[in-house]
Design a protein with these regions (language model features):
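Short alpha-helix in the alpha/beta-hydrolase fold that links the catalytic acid
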Residues: 93, 247-273
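Short beta-strand/loop motif that positions the catalytic acidic residue
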Residues: 237-239, 243
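Short amphipathic alpha-helix adjacent to the substrate-entry channel of hydrolases
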Residues: 91-113
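Serine-hydrolase catalytic-loop signature spanning alpha/beta hydrolases and amidase-signature enzymes
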Residues: 85-90, 110, 144
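N-terminal cap/lid segment of alpha/beta-hydrolase-fold proteins
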Residues: 19-73, 204
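Primarily recognizes the serine-hydrolase "nucleophile elbow" in alpha/beta-hydrolase
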Residues: 136, 140-231
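Bacterial Sec-dependent N-terminal signal peptides
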Residues: 1-22
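Short beta-strand element of the alpha/beta-hydrolase
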Residues: 73-86, 236
Length: 273
């Protein structure tokens, strides 16, 4: 009897080990993509600009990837934010599309967002304003998802950001900075408008805009003092030590002292956390 029970236990463990695990393995074969879902509206800059007064309001949209045949409520969500140095890129780039697909097949709901671009590398403050606009758009996306979490079958307490390069800048700044820490440049000058508070753009939903966790791929932050011990946001970072675009420690973006301010990369963020 003891041998029989032992065999049954071993067989049971073998069966369990052979089964795919949701959120780790691709347990769904098919996904459905809902394209161009509008999550907000905000003033956008032209591709070429010197000052920021010449804007046109645009819809902020995203593509939603979901597993077909999923009956689970309160699913975790991942917001993917693309790269592009704040002057190029969109949510059709291969990496964010592939990540959105494979995450949906693992049982997550993927929200692959577009955000406003606009960077003048000859301006000493354009980079700060570009990151801040991206923060506002990511905030609007999170607030939209939390507002409609029942329609999306999303757990509003399990909304994660996965950013790549510029997208990681957005995720890190949204996670760790507060309204009273916004750069002075975001308040505007005679030729550049006040961008408003972090949650004051895109839509009017009164939801919390902080992510519950963050994946940062070769990102950086503008001020290490923004990171507080009480933030308590789980963060996973990937970064090459010889990255020539975003410094692993501290330095200028693109490794060139032009007009953009110094930023602090993943190694120093890790030490601060």
């Amino acid at each position: 009897m003891i041998k029989s029970n032992l065999i049954l236990i071993i067989l049971g463990i073998s069966i369990l080990m052979g089964q795919d695990t949701r959120f780790i393995d691709e347990v769904f074969d098919d996904i459905i993509i809902t394209e161009d879902v509008v999550y907000g509206n905000a003033p956008d800059l032209p591709f070429w600009f010197l000052f920021e007064w010449n804007t046109v309001d645009i819809d902020l949209d995203m593509d939603i990837y979901e597993p077909v045949g999923d009956t689970l409520d309160n699913r975790p969500a991942i917001i993917f934010i693309h790269t592009g140095a704040f002057f190029s890129g969109n949510n059709e780039l291969d990496d964010v599309v592939d990540l959105s697909i494979t995450s949906a097949k693992r049982g997550y709901v993927s929200f692959n967002i577009n955000y406003r671009l606009g960077l003048n590398i000859l301006s000493s403050y354009s980079g700060e304003r570009a990151v801040y606009r991206g923060m506002q758009d990511a905030s609007a996306a999170i607030r939209h998802i939390r507002e409609y979490h029942e329609e999306y079958n999303i757990d509003p307490n399990k909304i994660f950001i996965w950013g790549s390069s510029a997208g990681s800048f957005i995720g890190l700044h949204l996670a760790y900075s507060q309204d009273d820490e916004r750069p002075q440049s975001t308040y505007g000058t005679g030729s550049d408008p006040d961008l408003g508070c972090i949650d004051c753009s895109g839509n009017s939903y009164m939801q919390d805009s902080k992510p519950n966790a963050l994946v940062s791929c070769w990102g950086a932050i503008g001020d290490l003092d923004w990171i507080e011990p009480t933030d308590n946001i789980p963060t996973l970072m990937f970064h090459g030590t010889l990255d020539p675009i975003v410094p692993f420690n501290s330095g200028f973006p693109f490794t060139i002292d032009i007009a953009l301010p110094i930023v602090y990369g993943s190694n120093l963020i890790h030490e601060r956390l």
